[in-house]
Amino acid sequence: MIVDAYNQFIRGYIVDPSKNPNGSPIGGIRTFINIFNKLTREIKPDLLVLVWDGKGGSKKRRSMNKSYKGGRKPPRTNWSQVGMVEEEITDNKVWQQMRVIEYFNQTPVIQFMEPLVEADDVISYVKNNPMFAEWQKVIVSADKDFIQLLDDKTILHRPIQKEYLNKNNVVEKFGIHPSNFALARAIVGDSSDNLPGVPRVGMETVAKRFSFLKEEQTYYLEHIIAECEKPENKQKVFSSIKENKELIKNNYDIMQLSSPMLSIQAKQGIDNTFEEYQPHYNQTEVRKLMLQDGVLTVTTTDLEQRFNNIITSFSQ
């Protein structure tokens, strides 16, 4: 199980106004543990991987497009009643996130946070690691960007949407095969990342006008342009796509995860982590941290059972 960690952490941070006895918000910690406990109960993974966005986000993508993720507003919480100014709320969010990382460093969970690298790239690299070629992989994230990674051995669980996506039901739902999903998204754009697409062209239009994208074969921008240039295709959508060819290319270069934007050193570090992995579980330290933070009442039964199972399986 490969978890887009910040994507899940921010859910709890936003909605849970819980405070510890010292008056500090701890909703992010509480809810993340609850979510992780539920995930392990449902999925029963043999290996647990948490991947966090590195500090500073993707330097490579920003160098390709200075507007990438520009204009994003800080996440809005529903716990303004805690009486903290914006700077204090930001500091608390960082503290809660680092505290979660500290918790799971005491467990068999493998964690990654590469500086100036997005979690997406690390998740793609982990998913494609030859060590796990025969493993069934479950990526956990609400982010549609990961649909492009789905194959016979990889599915996507979107907890907020309460759905599991595989390469077959993605075609049924969107009319686009995962192998062509990044291309389709490049045409449509992604407002959440401040990447505009071709005007007035959505996923349904792409699926309808380029029906070959539902095939497992991987198609590229030149195939889209060739379709647009057919004499019988006179609708506005085709000319708009031709006019925005460069925009689509730039979007695709940023959105694609088939070639994750990781340095050789980062890739080697990830490989070494897996090769040297020796699962451990310091339950005493975890309980100590939970007591300090006022979250000792949070249920961790399924997590603890899974931790012990992982340790047992790797010791055999």
Regions found by a protein language model. Give the residues of each.
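Noncatalytic, basic helical substrate-engagement surface that gates or grips nucleic-acid strands
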Residues: 1-138, 146-164, 256, 261-275
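Non-catalytic nucleic-acid-binding/docking modules located in mid-to-C-terminal regions
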Residues: 38-52, 67-74, 80, 107-110, ...
